[in-house]
Design a protein with these regions (language model features):
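Accessory alpha/beta interaction modules
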Residues: 1-158, 171
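Pocket-edge structural micro-motifs
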Residues: 129-132, 166-167, 203
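Low-complexity, glycine/alanine/valine/leucine- and proline-rich hydrophobic stretches
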Residues: 149-158, 163-168, 178-185
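Short, charged alpha-helical interaction segments and adjacent helix-coil junctions
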Residues: 2-18, 78, 85-90, 176-270
Length: 270
């Protein structure tokens, strides 16, 4: 039965919200936004640690490397001991490759160190990929990746951890239950109350639905802006290829700045 307030929103948005799961990163990001309780519960289950206490959590958190290239983390959390946790939701297998996990880990290290700080003080880090499919294909609920000394089999002890959580895994264990919950579209089917209440808010409460609709509107605006920028860059690239106009003329026609045109020209010449 529909609610009277649902008439305020676009039917296609409501339909999309009904189909969302925590395995959808846009929806998960909204559910975990500024929500320490949900983040803490997921980390406790994945890591098997009841003592873990999250102090800060950021959603869609941007980190940059030394060359200025940036990447956006789905969830970036800090616990009471200063340890860092990056949780990524990946529905596509290709987005959860080993090199990407390594890159995420390196970015955390680069961004938590201060100039002159001793490297021995590097904090312990965890990069956790929750994948819709069993990307490593061995049927395990969780895969723990740590550096080891090949000759002895001993842990190297650099405290940089990578974990893959198998979203297909189902049983009555905490991780099996969690992966079940991440695949539910209906809040009443979610077994962990902390997650169920959060999902219900964004699917069934007027204020929560309004927040989700606003988030989707913002995403549509961002996508439209990105498409326009791509079109302008394509126009500028074609004009640069012809080589008959100045940067200023190309900027005027393409509606890019002169600096953006220069940057495009630099990439062409690289």
């Amino acid at each position: 039965m529909s609610k009277d307030w649902e008439e305020k929103f676009r039917p296609e948005d409501l339909q999309r919200i009904r189909g969302f799961r925590l395995m959808d990163d846009d929806f998960m990001s909204k559910c975990f936004e500024e929500n320490i309780e949900c983040t803490e519960m997921v980390l406790q289950i994945v890591l098997g640690r009841d003592d873990l206490k999250v102090e800060k959590v950021a959603i869609q958190h941007q980190l940059k490397n030394l060359q200025g290239r940036s990447i956006i983390f789905d969830i970036y959390a800090t616990d009471h001991a200063g340890k860092r946790y990056n949780v990524e939701i990946q529905r596509a297998d290709r987005g959860a490759g080993a090199k990407r996990a390594r890159y995420h880990s390196s970015l955390i290290d680069a961004n938590v160190t201060e100039p002159g700080e001793k490297l021995e003080n590097l904090v312990e880090t965890y990069v956790i990929f929750i994948t819709e499919h069993d990307v490593l294909g061995k049927g395990k609920p969780i895969y723990h990746i740590d550096r080891v000394i090949k000759e002895t089999g001993e842990n190297f002890g650099d405290e940089a951890h990578i974990l893959y959580v198998n979203g297909e895994y189902r049983d009555e264990s905490p991780i099996g239950t969690l992966m079940h919950d991440f695949s539910c579209t209906n809040a009443k089917d979610i077994k962990y109350r902390t997650l169920s209440e959060r999902v219900r808010y964004f699917k069934e409460d007027e204020k929560g639905v309004a927040a989700m609709c606003k988030a989707m509107e913002d995403m549509r605006d961002e996508a439209a802006l990105a498409a326009r920028l791509a079109e302008r860059k394509e126009v500028a690239s074609r004009l640069l290829k012809k080589g008959a106009m100045s940067f200023e003329e190309i900027a005027e026609i393409s509606q890019l700045s002169v600096e953006e045109v220069r940057a495009l020209a630099g990439k062409r010449g690289a």
